[in-house]
Regions:
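Beta-sandwich interaction modules
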Residues: 25, 30-36, 81-106, 115-120
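Glycine-centered loop/turn motifs
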Residues: 17-19, 32-41, 52-53, 58-59, ...
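C-terminal interaction-tip segments
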Residues: 1-41, 111-121
Length: 121
């Protein structure tokens, strides 16, 4: 294929690389409260909630960068001079039908737990 670098499954064309950042690497479904961990060298780039869902207060939603992406470990305030972001805890409910975007390495639902997590690079 023209434009493809040789050397293995992890080498992508520009278009394939862009698709990978949008969750086209794959997805995982969770209908319980077990933790989901992203595959090696990958992250979860979006989460769609099938049912109303909460996360464990500690370790429930682990961001690649807790300053940039909403998470349960710290209040995300990504830009200099920004404020007002709060740390997620088990009192925050994400309603069915909502999709959130970010870069997370682990998703650990506390309740509800009908969700689809989309995998990207």
């Amino acid at each position: 294929m023209a434009g493809r670098r040789q050397g293995g499954a992890q080498h992508f064309t520009v278009q394939e690389a862009q698709n990978a950042t949008l969750g086209q690497v794959g997805s995982m479904y969770n209908d319980g409260t077990a933790a989901m961990v992203a595959p090696t060298d990958h992250v979860f780039v979006a989460i769609t909630f099938i049912t109303d869902t909460t996360f464990d207060s500690s370790g429930g939603l682990i961001a690649v960068d807790s300053d940039r992406f909403v998470n349960t470990e710290a209040a995300a305030t990504p830009l200099a001079g920004s404020s007002g972001g709060v740390q997620l805890d088990s009192s925050n409910t994400f309603p069915a039908g909502l999709t959130i975007y970010g870069r997370w390495t682990e998703i650990d639902p506390a309740s509800g737990s009908g969700l689809i997590a989309y995998i990207g690079k």
